[in-house]
Amino acid sequence: MVTSEFKLFKFMLMGMSIAVALALSGPCRAFDIKGGVSKESGPFDLFKFGFKAYKNGQKEEAVEAYRYAAEKGHTGSRWALANMYADGDGVTQDDFEAFKIYSEIAQQGVEPGSEDTGFFVNALLSLANYYKHGIAGSPVRIDLSQARQLYFQVASTFGVPEAQFQLAQMMLAGEGGNASPQQAKKWLNQARKSGHPGAMAVFGNILFDEGQTARGLALMTAALDRCKPKDCGWMEALQEQAFSVANEADRRTAVSLSHSIATGSDD
């Protein structure tokens, strides 16, 4: 499953990337020469204009500016444009178009320490999601092996909790390769230490099934305090099932432990 943690990651990335742009940009005007920005402007100026236009609800102007900046090689604009296509935000939703742009970013690569690293990582994660689910009506078919490889790259090289969680899920299910429960537990444990609610829930359920009843139930309970509404349903089902078969002593211990987990005093 693709959780809202991924969308939050995209939102945070955009916020960090445009901090300088916001500081340097003035009021947004129409995309013309009088506004000081045209298609001949530099890629960073076009990116700044595109972001300001987007923020002001002028999404057609934002798309136009991002396109011109992307044609000039601006990675952040490519990424923003891909997200708009993926979400149907200001343009007709087109996952295949988003896939193609994310692929361009991934193929371009990044130098160590590059300011474009976040865009590159996000593109890899987006591509992994597309390969995992495929894109109907397009040449992009489900390729679980490729999805697993991309999740592994992002999880191991960049330590992104969402990638660690998705990789672990595939390892547990034996998707895209051999099942590897022990490796899956390792990745889930890393992701849950970063506060990923899905990883907390799944890792907790595994511990519960292995006999660590109170600790497993505590992690599943703590996950419910962190999950986004759209992701809470399956976590609630896991927690309620475990809670229903746990004895009273384990329930009480789990509640106490869940508070420690929530405050970060339990690792």
Swiss-Prot record:
Keyword Disulfide bond listed: no
Signal peptide: 1-23
Record keywords: Exopolysaccharide synthesis, Signal
One Pfam family linked to the record: Sel1
GO BP term (any one): polysaccharide biosynthetic process
SUPFAM superfamilies in alphabetical order: HCP-like
Domain of life where this protein originates: Bacteria
InterPro entries assigned to the protein according to its UniProt record, in alphabetical order: EPS_Regulator, Sel1-like, Sel1_AlgK, TPR-like_helical_dom_sf
NCBIfam families: TransRegExoR
Protein name listed in UniProt: Exopolysaccharide production negative regulator
Organism: Rhizobium leguminosarum bv. viciae
